[in-house]
Design a protein with these regions (language model features):
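Active-site-adjacent mobile loop/cap segments within catalytic or ligand-binding domains
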Residues: 5-7, 61-64, 69-79, 117-177
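Ser/Thr/Gly/Pro-rich low-complexity, disordered linker/stalk segments of secreted
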Residues: 172-194
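Catalytic-core regions of hydrolytic enzymes
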Residues: 1-96
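Solvent-exposed, polar/charged alpha-helical surfaces in well-ordered, non-transmembrane soluble domains
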Residues: 26-33, 37, 99, 103, ...
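Active-site-adjacent substrate-binding region
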Residues: 92-118
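Short, solvent-exposed mixed-charge patches
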Residues: 1, 195-196
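Surface-exposed patches in mature extracellular/periplasmic domains of secreted proteins
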Residues: 42-50, 111-119, 174-176
Length: 196
């Protein structure tokens, strides 16, 4: 199981992409908070009051080298474009976490031609590589696509669980309703009364 270090993209006055009354910076911070809640002690959230790109934060970062850095973003384009994918630094091979994350995000937010996209023109993947950190940037669908955005907002818990599972981080089972209408947790019935 990995320890996840989560950076929420944009912020500190930079709203990032916008769509349907939402900003990328606010949405990815909401997702980061959900990851923290569900992942517990296996997740550390980077200071969300910063813009880690603008202030060059990764270059002064001091975390254990075996922690996995995940930077959260949402894409923007014309409303018909959709889908999620993982970005890694050009010249590096995807590791098991990149692959698992890409498989999950492309099934949760389908639509992109490439699940994993190596890039050599982004600062934070390069900075993390220079510092020897394992890093990937996750595009959580398009904020400008109503389907992606509605799924992001309406199924954020499922999105967070899928991300955490890609890193081998177990999460609490969601509460479910038993056949007798009683709420159960973790698949264990709290009331064994059978109704006929």
């Amino acid at each position: 199981m990995a320890h996840l270090y989560v950076i929420a993209g944009h912020g500190a006055g930079d709203c990032g992409a916008v769509g349907y009354g939402y900003t990328e910076a606010e949405r990815v911070r909401a997702l980061a908070s959900r990851l923290s809640t569900l992942g517990g002690g296996n997740v550390t959230i980077a200071d969300m009051n910063r813009n880690w790109y603008a202030d060059n934060g990764i270059m002064s970062l001091n975390i254990p080298k075996d922690w996995q850095i995940l930077e959260l973003h949402m894409d923007s384009n014309v409303p018909s474009v959709k889908g999620g994918h993982v970005i890694i630094e050009e010249g590096y091979s995807p590791d098991k976490y990149d692959t698992a994350l890409a498989n999950f995000i492309s099934s949760f937010f389908p639509g992109r031609a490439e699940k994993i996209k190596p890039r050599d023109d982004l600062a934070n993947p390069w900075r993390a590589a220079q510092r020897g950190y394992s890093y990937r940037l996750l595009e959580n669908g398009f904020i400008t696509n109503s389907g992606d955005l509605n799924k992001f907002n309406g199924q954020m818990g499922d999105l967070a669980r899928g991300i955490l599972n890609a890193f081998g981080i177990a999460t609490a089972s969601p509460a479910k309703e038993d056949s007798d209408g009683k709420v159960t947790s973790g698949g264990t019935s709290q009331d064994s009364v059978q109704h006929y």
